[in-house]
Amino acid sequence: MTASFSCKMIASLDTGAGVYAWTTVEGITGNILIDPEGVIARPCTAAGDPLGDTLLDKRVGNVQNPDPDPGVRTAFLKIAAVLFMEKERQGRLPDAVTRTYW
């Protein structure tokens, strides 16, 4: 089974946070907000306004108030993890990321 997603930064907020639009090969889409320090991820609108209470803090390592939809929950976790890793690797939030898993 192959899983794939791509995400692209669509906004850099005045606070330094990045807003990404993402999509999976299965057609699941959304937006994710990464804080300026690169440690907090939240689902959000395209304008960067948080949606719901879902929150991933990489310092803690688990999701608070996860989405009940397993597809959305899994995609959110994978995308947040990759963005956190790229921030650490590059020293800044990436412009775009694509990943494929087999």
Task: Say what each PLM segment does.
Residues 41-102:
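Acidic, low-complexity intrinsically disordered segments
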Residues 5-37:
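Amphipathic, interaction-prone secondary-structure segments
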